[in-house]
Design a protein with these regions (language model features):
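Extended beta-strand/beta-hairpin segments
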Residues: 1-42, 53-147
Length: 147
């Protein structure tokens, strides 16, 4: 399957990407704009998030809120590639099964998230963690590291 999009320059260091359906994502080096490197992290968070929510929904996990926090370490020297990324899946709800959430994250990391799979083929490790908050309290754990 081939994917295609177009990136257009709009002066200075302002660009936008347009996909075949017409969706537009702006990019900028200016304050308040997303740089391409941050969009890469956003793509990873969005990709694994969509996978995890899909699997948790199928497993009937009773969650009210879900978010993904992504942080990364970069090399000092150019091209300043990412060397390690931490993806924290934060889930809040009632009676949440740690096993079901962990399995959803593992399936995303190992099977479904092509953004993570692509990054992990290079010189970058991706550590997926989870933080669950429900009536039992808050708990965290590392789920899986790839790359």
């Amino acid at each position: 399957m081939t994917k295609h999009l177009t990136v257009r320059w709009h002066g200075e260091l302002d660009f936008d990407a347009t996909d075949e359906g017409g969706a537009i994502v702006p990019m900028s080096s200016k304050e308040g704009g997303f740089s391409p490197s941050l969009l890469l992290l956003a793509a990873l968070g969005g990709c694994t998030g969509m996978d995890a929510v899909s699997v948790m929904t199928k497993k009937k996990v009773d969650f009210d809120t879900y978010r993904v926090d992504v942080s990364a370490e970069q090399r000092e020297a150019y091209p300043k590639a990412y060397t390690s990324i931490v993806v924290e899946h934060i889930v809040e709800g009632r009676g949440i099964s740690d096993k079901a959430v962990s399995r959803a994250i593992e399936l995303s990391a190992r099977k479904y998230c092509m953004v993570g799979a692509t990054l992990a083929t290079g010189d970058c490790s991706i550590n997926h963690r989870m933080r669950i908050s429900d009536e039992q309290g808050e708990r965290t754990c590392d789920c899986i590291t790839i790359g």
